[in-house]
Structures are given as structure tokens and as C-alpha cells.
From Swiss-Prot:
UniProt-annotated location(s): Virion; Host membrane
Cellular compartments per GO CC: helical viral capsid; host cell membrane; membrane
Encoding gene (name): VIII
InterPro entries reported in the protein's UniProt record: G8P, Phage_M13_G8P_capsid_dom_sf
Name of this chain's protein: Capsid protein G8P
Similarity section: Belongs to the inovirus capsid protein family.
Keyword Transport found: no
This protein's UniProt keywords: Capsid protein, Helical capsid protein, Host membrane, Membrane, Signal, Transmembrane, Transmembrane helix, Virion
Source organism per UniProt: Enterobacteria phage I2-2
Signal sequence interval, chain numbering: 1-29
Length: 84
């Protein structure tokens, strides 16, 4: 195969790929949003958001406790070193 033939073949592949991409984008845009796959994806994202919110709510007391404990340790070290 010559270089020109390879370049022409590559151009044809690019044109076909671009056409398929445009066709699939058009089909996706034409979707009315009531398809089963879309509703499953929406349910999954809503479930994930709910779980993330629950985990964040459970994490705040732990973070607060660690921060207060760290502050208490620093203050204890500071005042105990001055007392000696």
C-alpha cells in the first residue's frame, strides 16, 4: 500500500466515525427522557447522592471529635510545659 492509499483509508475512517458519532448524538438528543435506561440511571444517581449525604452526616461528629481532641492535646501540652 502506498502512502496516499493509507491516507485516503484513514480519511474514510474518520468520515465514517464522525458520521456515526453525529447519528448517535442525534438519536440521544431525540430521546424523550422516559426510556428505561435513563430512569435506571436517574435512580442510581439519586441513590448515590442519598448514600453520600448519609455518610457525610455520619462523618461530621467524628471530625468534630478529632478536632476538639487535637486542640485539647495542644492546650494541655502548652500549659503543662509552662507549669514546670
Amino acid at each position: 500500500m502506498s502512502v496516499i492509499t493509507k491516507v485516503a483509508a484513514a480519511k474514510n475512517k474518520i468520515v465514517v466515525g464522525a458520521g456515526l458519532l453525529m447519528a448517535s448524538a442525534g438519536a440521544f438528543a431525540a430521546d424523550d427522557g422516559t426510556s428505561t435506561a435513563t430512569s435506571y440511571a436517574t435512580e442510581a444517581m439519586n441513590s448515590l447522592k442519598t448514600q453520600a449525604t448519609d455518610l457525610i452526616d455520619q462523618t461530621w461528629p467524628v471530625v468534630t471529635s478529632v478536632a476538639v481532641a487535637g486542640l485539647a492535646i495542644r492546650l494541655f501540652k502548652k500549659f503543662s510545659s509552662k507549669a514546670v
